[in-house]
Amino acid sequence: MNIKKGKFLETILAEKRLEIAKMPEEQVGKVRQTYNFYDYLKEHSDQLQVIAEVKKASPSLGDINLEVDIVDQAKNYEQAGAAMISVLTDPVFFKGNIEYLCEISENVQIPTLNKDFIIDKKQINRAVNAGATVILLIVAVFENQYPKLQNLYNYALSLGLEVLVETHNKAELEIAHQLGAKIIGVNNRNLKTFEVILQNSVDLTPYFKEDSIYISESGIFSANEAQKVSDTFNGILVGTALMQSENLEKSLKDLKVKRKTNEN
């Protein structure tokens, strides 16, 4: 599907509402057992931790790696030291599938993130039943709808999920803090234009709070880029660079750069 420049998020959300209308109501089960992602990053603060993403395609890049065996890719991520695996489940724009999340969650021991544009409780129930232990809520999706964001955030926590709350600017970061979010992402990609500026992560660091952990998302391909955010961020989310890597283990380990923390 073609998207007009500047209309990325608007177009995706319109399609998402159609998808949800057809989505069946599911009786929610129990969240899969694994370690707590927040605690893990707090306890492993000497290195920048990596959320490794399984992503076949994207609106900005088109096809990335359509032939990938998603389970093998996820297992390789786990063996190479990823702290969590992010799984794209949007079928239209990212060529993802909820079944990918099911298959990966059944074959790894570490946390899995349902990466999608979540705007409804039906999606959260589905994520739990597919094996996710963390979901993504994007502040930009809930423009002028803070009560809805708060409701979905609290609902996810009540089920035993962790929530990665994604922000892009200072105003959205303040909303994440207002929510009481413990895991906060800073997306270097503007979801309205899809442009990526790594400096975006750096610019927001003066507003960070000590109790939360912070993840820099998008635009990180090398150890040098990882190093730029390593002192103030606890982790990074990386998809394209790992999906295209010819030496996945080395690529992932190179991204886990040393951090300067209060302890070292």
UniProtKB/Swiss-Prot annotation:
Q: Which GO terms describe its molecular function?
A: indole-3-glycerol-phosphate synthase activity; phosphoribosylanthranilate isomerase activity
Key words of the record? Amino-acid biosynthesis, Aromatic amino acid biosynthesis, Decarboxylase, Lyase, Tryptophan biosynthesis
Q: Which residues form a coiled coil?
A: none
What metabolic or biological pathway is this protein involved in? Amino-acid biosynthesis; L-tryptophan biosynthesis; L-tryptophan from chorismate: step 4/5
Provide a GO biological process annotation. Answer: L-tryptophan biosynthetic process
InterPro entries associated with the record:
Aldolase_TIM, Indole-3-glycerol_P_synth, Indole-3-glycerol_P_synth_dom, Indole-3-GlycerolPSynthase_CS, RibuloseP-bd_barrel
Q: What protein name is recorded for this chain?
A: Indole-3-glycerol phosphate synthase
**Protein species of origin:** Lactococcus lactis subsp. lactis (strain IL1403) (Streptococcus lactis)
